[in-house]
Amino acid sequence: MDIEQLREKSADELKAHLTDLRKEQFSLRMQQVTGQLPKTHETRRVRREIARVKHLLGSTK
């Protein structure tokens, strides 16, 4: 999801999206540890999207 789509969301929606992203990050990390992660770039994508959401949450306060 790009930054423009994230800016359109409310703070509650961003918090829910952040929770989903953290769950996805945990799942990807577990797959990586067990050697079952074929697309290693996904961890980077999720980490960056978490940073985008946290940035928007901090700037809306």
Curated annotation (Swiss-Prot):
A UniProt-annotated Pfam family: Ribosomal_L29
Gene Ontology terms: biological process: translation
GO MF annotation terms: structural constituent of ribosome
Annotated keywords: Ribonucleoprotein, Ribosomal protein
The keyword Ribosomal protein is annotated on this UniProt entry: yes
Entry coiled-coil feature ranges: none
Family (UniProt): Belongs to the universal ribosomal protein uL29 family.
Protein name: Large ribosomal subunit protein uL29
Source species: Xanthomonas axonopodis pv. citri (strain 306)
